Amino acid sequence: MKTYLEIKVPINYDDPWFEELRSHFAGIPVRWQKDFYHITLVFINDTPKGMDLCTILKKHLVTAQAPVLTFDQLDVFAVSSGMHIIHLTATDVPDTFLALIESIHDDMKSVGCVILSDFMLHVTLGRLKDFNIQLPVLRSLAKSFSMSPLSMVLTDVDYREFRGKTIYETQLSRKENL
């Protein structure tokens, strides 16, 4: 069974910067994501039959602090199908957040989970299937978009079936000085 662990990112389709971004890409047939913004922490291609991964997740997430991420870059990448993904990312990611993801990833692999992709911090904003528009053109357009950094505390974590129901959800604790 394909599953994934995600942390929700509290952005809104109607945010002014997102409206400006869509205008910036006017004339390009982007399918903009309208909700469910998140960062996939671990994508599990296959889970051993009968394996309950909630124990591993609780081990790591019960004491984890909510990361503060500053999204300060817009970029585009292509997936194996050739589709282009327009996304937000952060250039400075807290080491504690990266260590948490790596520990969860390692523990899941150690119990036999098949994980074929490495972690890549990004929040999908839109998808483009027009193969006539080349990646360098899209990247140049993304880089020319001027945006102010967006700092956010990320607290809501979901473990879900791929395109299915939530298996486990929790909230990471906030640091007391936030």
Where are these regions (language model features)?
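Histidine-dependent nucleotide/RNA phosphoesterase domain, centered on the 2H-phosphoesterase fold
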Residues: M1-L178
